Amino acid sequence: MKLQRRGLLKAGLMGLGWTAMRGLAAASNSPTKFVFHVSSTPFGLLDWLRDRGYAHITAELEKRGFPSMLVHSSVRGSDTPNGDRASAVVKALQNVTNDVVIVGISNEGNYLPLVAAARPIRRVVYVNACIPRPGKPFIEVCQTEQVAVPGSYLDKLLKASQSITDDFLGLINDQNATEAHLKAMQDRIDASSSAHTLVGFYEVCPLKALPKVDTVCVSGSADDQIRPEWEQSAARRDLGVEPVVISGAGHGNIIYAKYAAELADACVKGL
């Protein structure tokens, strides 16, 4: 179905993919660069404020000899935010010859493997992040596994969107579904404040398998949105790595001053 393929096409896996191969010979002489995606605000007016949220972690990476890059793009009104974010990152890296580490926090985890499938990546870092399942939307993972912390904002969004989720999952598995059906479902998702807030959860991961790339998964022990137990279990099962647990770190504050040094250490270890 087109709903399942559009993320793949928008991520540029066949178009922009491998452009960076031209500069790989020079990469060994350049420091590894860390890349974060930042969702742009309307007209970019408050992008500077969102950028400040990354100041502590990027400063800690810089102390360790690793430059950082913030890639801005908007996902407002997008049917395929994961694919769009991946496409923006791949495009931004076209002329970058450094080795690259991409870092995803929270729902950003859903776009990371799309970038790794499109161009050479030195390392992928999931931070309190969704770990996508090839061939499935992340919302389906949330139905079969206890991803959200009970009573959390994420949990409330999932429960408020349940009827839409049920219909969506039924539709994408219906071989007789038409483009009109898919469009109507997307309109329902966009019109629902709860479902719309679950950015990228209703987008089917177009990959057949997660790319084989060096991977780090960092879990804050006090994450109040994504259950640390789920994050750590999924890291072992789906990513094949032992998660790094930062004691006391919550869902969003893990990149701020108190925990930034520990996070940076986890990100750069072994590079």
Residue ranges: model-predicted function:
Residues 70-101, 141:
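Active-site loop/oxyanion-hole signature of alpha/beta-hydrolase fold enzymes
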Residues 222-246:
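Conserved loop-alpha-helix segment in the C-terminal half of the alpha/beta-hydrolase fold
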Residues 7-27:
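N-terminal export signals
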Residues 217-219:
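Short beta-strand/loop motif that positions the catalytic acidic residue
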Residues 249-258:
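Catalytic histidine-centered segment of alpha/beta-hydrolase-like enzymes
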Residues 56-78:
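Conserved alpha/beta-hydrolase
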Residues 33-61:
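Short, surface-exposed "cap/lid" segments of acyl-processing enzymes
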Residues 126-156:
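Flexible "cap/lid" loop of the alpha/beta hydrolase fold
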